[in-house]
């Protein structure tokens, strides 16, 4: 299979960017509904991260700040990927986290090159990932 039209094709995976703003769980459900095996994106290398940041940045022209959900969430004080993949790479500032902010976003103010944690009920744009 090829990637759906308008999605990024990068090293055997497809990435779809959606600007509808949804809470994290609804964004994950949306990804799953689009294609079998799709989830909010997991990011495992700096190359993958840069490719995603560049892809999302094409849609941004200095408009209002719009952080983007990825598939990273905090469960029992451990960060994990919703697709079950192992966490090999992080762009989170691992210092200390305000309570109640258990889901991760690509931070728009960094050009999507750093991650931040946000309240999972906040509404953000999101990026889905599936295998090509």
From Swiss-Prot:
One term of GO molecular function: carbohydrate binding
The keyword Disulfide bond belongs to this UniProt entry's keyword annotation: yes
This protein's GO CC annotations: extracellular region
InterPro entries with a match to the protein in the record: C-type_lectin-like, C-type_lectin-like/link_sf, C-type_lectin/snaclec_domain, C-type_lectin_CS, CTDL_fold
Residues covered by the C-type lectin domain: 10-129
Main location: secreted
Keyword Disulfide bond appears in the UniProt entry: yes
Protein location: Secreted, Extracellular space, Extracellular matrix
PROSITE patterns: C_TYPE_LECTIN_1 (PS00615), C_TYPE_LECTIN_2 (PS50041)
Gene3D superfamilies: Mannose-Binding Protein A, subunit A
Disulfide bonds: 3-14, 31-128, 103-120
PANTHER family, sorted: MANNOSE, PHOSPHOLIPASE, LECTIN RECEPTOR RELATED
Protein name: Struthiocalcin-1
Organism: Struthio camelus
